């Protein structure tokens, strides 16, 4: 299905007035007015404006986890787990393709947090799954250098009241905070960290899985020993 933008006035009248236009050019303009819709888990991109941008260097408490990018509208869970595993152990360099298969992610059901937890545990990680978390819980984990996977409502195809929305669940990683903001690694956003004002984050911090409400959900994945911890300052030689 295609969503159509408003096209020039030339196409809002009767096309028989424009028989002189070559058919190839006409088709080009028609398709130029069409864009594919983006739905689901965090691929509905919105253009950033100067007012929306902030500098990571100005955030006093920020964990620099690897930036990962989901390749489809149902693999946000895959991408956040990929980031977290590599963050804790740089030898756990799993490709998205591998994790999609291991986690059995699919377009209908997305990625199950329970499957994510089971996979992490099978690799020797400690996993703590919580609901009913508080903002202070998030802050305390971040203060100790531990990012938190959260489920929020985000990237809806149309304007919605996220406090009442349960249909646009999205995985992100809470990695930082300041007085009025929470910062994230959001796999729907290429190359940059993201943020939400605290009040808005709290309104969005919920989801539903197979009929079960997940309010203030958080998943904490840790290594008992962090010998190969990810360091964004490292630059590797190509082999």
Report the location of each language-model feature:
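Bacterial N-terminal signal peptides
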Residues: 24-37
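Noncatalytic regulatory segments and standalone regulatory/sensor domains
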Residues: 42-50, 166, 175-239
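Extracytoplasmic/secreted envelope proteins and their assembly/folding machinery
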Residues: 77-85, 96-100, 113-117, 135, ...
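Bacterial N-terminal signal peptides that target proteins for export
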Residues: 4-26
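Active-site-adjacent substructure of cysteine-protease-like catalytic cores
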Residues: 131-187, 193-194
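Structured segments of extracytoplasmic/periplasmic soluble domains
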Residues: 83-91, 102-106, 119-126, 140-145, ...
């Amino acid at each position: 299905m295609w969503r159509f933008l408003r096209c020039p006035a030339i196409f809002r009248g009767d096309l028989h007035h424009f028989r002189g236009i070559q058919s190839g050019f006409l088709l080009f303009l028609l398709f130029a007015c069409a864009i594919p819709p983006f739905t689901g888990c965090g691929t509905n991109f919105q253009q950033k404006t100067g007012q929306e941008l902030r500098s990571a260097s100005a955030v006093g408490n920020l964990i620099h986890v690897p930036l990962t990018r989901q390749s489809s509208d149902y693999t946000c869970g895959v991408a956040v787990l990929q980031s977290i595993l590599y963050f804790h152990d740089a030898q756990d360099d799993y490709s998205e393709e591998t994790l999609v298969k291991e986690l059995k992610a699919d377009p209908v059901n997305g990625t199950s947090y329970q499957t994510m937890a089971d996979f992490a545990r099978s690799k020797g990680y400690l996993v703590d799954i919580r609901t009913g978390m508080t903002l202070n819980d998030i802050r305390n984990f971040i203060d100790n250098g531990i990012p938190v996977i959260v489920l929020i409502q985000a990237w809806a195809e149309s304007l919605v009241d996220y406090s009442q929305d349960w249909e646009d669940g999205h995985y992100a990683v809470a990695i930082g905070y300041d007085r009025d903001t929470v910062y994230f690694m959001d796999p729907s956003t290429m190359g940059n960290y993201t943020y939400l004002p605290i009040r808005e984050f709290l309104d969005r911090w919920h989801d539903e899985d197979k009929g079960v409400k997940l309010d203030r959900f958080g998943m904490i994945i840790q290594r008992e020993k962090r010998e190969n911890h990810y360091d964004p300052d490292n630059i590797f030689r190509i082999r």
